[in-house]
Amino acid sequence: MNRQKVIAIDGPGASGKGTVAARVAAALGYDYLDTGALYRLTALYAQKQGVEWHDEENVSALAKKLPAVFSGNRILLDGEDVSDGIRTEAIGMGASAVAQWPKVRAALLQRQRDFLTEKGLVADGRDTGSVVFPQAELKIFLTAESKIRAERRAKQIGIPCEGFTFERILSDIETRDEADRNRKVAPLKQQPDALLLDTSRLTIEETVKKVLDWYRKV
């Protein structure tokens, strides 16, 4: 089997995989792909077009012609900067909703694969190692306890790690975990050839170092 110059990092929402993947890519001089952003963009685009997330046919049609442009750290949708707009909890739930549809996943699959060049790629998502880049040189399943993930998200948006808003964040994370694990197409799970990395007690720096150490041994 010919291995691809890819590090595939999969895991649940708010596990820190995006931050880790971006830093690993920077350290190696590789490109970085947040596959989840494409599903978030699809959910947001559907919302803007008045298409319900449960409408597989029309959502997949939008996914095929998704007018998205990745420019540095910014993401444009139909010319509008939506870099922050796609990161809301509501759009995260929308991404999980549209990701359950086979036609939507098929529409976005080749677009994700097109990000790979000779330069090398670090990709994060929920099925990057199992579906998008099954021949990746290194596959990692990165996770953390749900409460830890909720605390990290709360700190990220500047709210206390207690109270109603925090409990809502925790509930949203657990709800999305359940949906991702139980969807019929490409459910979220650790693949047999993926290394497990629990970051509950690790800093970002420690996690990045662990990934780089593993990659150098491939």
UniProtKB/Swiss-Prot annotation:
GO molecular function per UniProt: ATP binding; CMP kinase activity; dCMP kinase activity
- Which reaction is recorded as catalysed by this protein? CMP + ATP = CDP + ADP; dCMP + ATP = dCDP + ADP
Residues reported in the UniProt entry to bind ATP? G11, P12, G13, A14, S15, G16, K17, G18, T19
Keywords assigned: ATP-binding, Cytoplasm, Kinase, Nucleotide-binding, Transferase
* Compartments where located: Cytoplasm
Class of the enzyme per the UniProt entry, highest EC level: transferase
What broad class describes the main subcellular location of this protein? cytoplasm
The entry's family comment says: Belongs to the cytidylate kinase family. Type 1 subfamily.
Q: What is this protein called?
A: Cytidylate kinase
Q: What is the lineage of its organism?
A: Bacteria, Pseudomonadati, Pseudomonadota, Betaproteobacteria, Neisseriales
